[in-house]
């Protein structure tokens, strides 16, 4: 097989590179390594800063499992380890041989200081990576959101370059990409639908999360499979010291987390659950027809770990979530995600660290019609099984090498309609589609000098369409050209791609730098939707004989400047992203139950470019940020608008977000957000006619119109319980849409009932002002 030969060549090149560069640095240096943990809980700390100063000065950060490694010559050094919310650890060390130094940081609660970042104070200036943001969990808990439920995805949409797919929607667009072009990972497992209650909530329970990182551009080579961004979310490992309880009770939802040790300092667990209870209020409704209806979601995060010995640690984590919507004796609808990750961390030696992961991910939905004589059930699902092997090798203080490979087996069940005997509905089963996605990568973080840093790498990916079903080909007009059945195990067609990645920074001084990056990304799984917002019933397809991988090349350039002793951050980034093999459907296409959906697809290209400005205050009683995005996103298809470029649905030229958090005294925290964006690009009718007594419309150019601009002000206040008590609690009071703005959710056109010859536009709004209150506790 072509891939196996290329993979062997790839591994050989890695081996030669390792041997060559290792020999260069295997002189008189010794290795200092260890793991950074919280002294209170034993939780490993991601991105903790480790600095060594003495005869030389070097620094690094702990990886996703708290591990760090540095190469230094023999001598006496001062070691400093810092992480936000923890007291800085300082120790004088003597290096005479390879050494291991694990560090337990003590929590430090300074009530007069609220901070936004968990990295070195000038990390944003000195690192080579650009277009990357880390969200602090405490900030997420302070930002006011809908119904008072703290939401990672809603907070994410307050950053420049990341735009909401709509009010009450967890979908988001990154630098002109579609909502399915974001790789969303929970403990390395992909999440296909990251929303609850049709998008009003995200799948991520912030109580269970310890780290959130988003890459908007120049994504590292270990990530692949999506065009626009990576959202890497990591769950808490669990408290290794003592058993604790944490939760909250709100107006429509409650949550509870339990964590503690199996064996103190060696293994731990974490279980966190949520459930809404809107259905409980329906049971009290005066209208008896509403009492049997169902509307709720639940989710459960669970994780356990066990340190087998000093070199091996085992992790098992999972997520299980479900939404249920039903009308009594008439209709039922449920959907949800399930993920599972089994990981083994292994330390080969003081410089080579590995992580092996077995991953599963499933998304499915079912729709039931319960009306007598018309009963039927519709079901659809996506199943992934993934094997990953990642290595990190500290070659020297100048080089940190990462390399690995992964394989993902995809199975899509597009849809099945089943019905009982006596139903008028015919049964239908659309054939499953199977695919095998393989990738290998290598990247090097290279500190060329004190001023110049590089992160460069290469990802080699392939996608093979697998047999087990019938595959057809279609011409440009959607007419069938051929049809053939392929047996299980047969390779129908394979696609191969090289994805180079490079990021570079030049440090002008301690507080200023300029950066540039380039990345090619490939996407093999594609979302089809008839609506402008994400929906639980959206259809995924994979590469086939007709559908090729989507491609994107992103070029970025930025200026970064810290002010006032690194208390303020400013950045300006510009980007340009051409896209190939973009997918649209023909006018009038209905995706539901469509057995030949590929016949209704057309292929074109896209482009996105823009400017992102970001100003952030990190420290002090008052902090927050201001983000502004000026951008343009367009698509071009030969069969749409005579082949002219048109506004993509993601196009919102102006987007502003303002976030403020104020610590007032020892117990009160006030926060507020303001958001503004250009209205959605939509298509309005330009004429109408009567057909069989019904009004029909002629529509203008694709997305040639806009809904009214969107803006909203939110506010929240948090009252902390009395300090220095073992039982901790707080009250959170919030107002969503404080000035009751009627933002457009949809625009409908209908005949004016008073003058049928006239057409009127009717705006539908989703939310007015919504108050919320939540009681949080921890003991």
Identify the meaning behind each predicted range.
Residues 103, 158-159, 203-246, 255-257, ...:
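A beta-strand signature from Gram-negative outer-membrane beta-barrel systems
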Residues 407-511, 640-643:
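Signature of Gram-negative outer-membrane beta-barrel scaffolds
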Residues 575-578, 597-686:
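Gram-negative outer-membrane beta-barrel transporters
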Residues 364-365, 411-422, 464-478, 506-555, ...:
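Surface-exposed extracellular loop regions of Gram-negative outer-membrane beta-barrel proteins
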Residues 117, 121, 126-180, 186-219, ...:
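Periplasmic N-terminal accessory/gating domains of Gram-negative outer-membrane beta-barrel systems
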Residues 37, 41, 48-53, 82-86, ...:
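Short, acidic, small-residue-rich periplasmic hinge/interaction motif at the N-terminus
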